[in-house]
Curated annotation (Swiss-Prot):
Any one biological process term the GO annotation gives: urea catabolic process
CDD domains xref list: Urease_gamma
One Gene Ontology term, aspect cellular component: cytoplasm
Protein source organism: Prochlorococcus marinus (strain NATL2A)
Subunit: Heterotrimer of UreA (gamma), UreB (beta) and UreC (alpha) subunits. Three heterotrimers associate to form the active enzyme.
Entry protein name: Urease subunit gamma
Length: 100
């Protein structure tokens, strides 16, 4: 199986996001890389489910709270940008201040 560099990057994001989700389910707080991966994965899956860019940008600010991440993480993540495949093509989704 051949994977392009972009596909390899997305596979790494998915792997990190699944680990982050397991940790969230156990009540652990996410660190910076885990939080970014988890948010990115939510965007990728939302696009796959047919949600619009604007819907994902609005919902993206409600997915994680300060209580779910380690101290200092919200201040480190001002925005998350991820290219996602939508029914009408690939688009860049930006989540501004995604941790509330």
């Amino acid at each position: 199986m051949y994977l392009s560099p972009q596909e390899k990057d997305k596979l790494l994001v998915v792997t990190a996001a699944l680990l982050a989700e397991r940790r969230l389910n156990r009540g652990l707080k996410l660190n910076h890389p885990e939080a970014v991966a988890w948010l990115s994965f939510q965007v990728l899956e939302g696009a796959r489910d047919g949600k619009s860019v604007s819907t994902l940008m609005n919902e993206g600010t409600t997915w994680l709270t300060k209580e779910q991440v380690m101290e200092g993480v919200p201040e480190l993540i001002h925005e998350v940008q991820i290219e996602a495949v939508f029914p009408d093509g690939t688009k860049l989704v930006t989540l501004h201040n995604p941790i509330s």
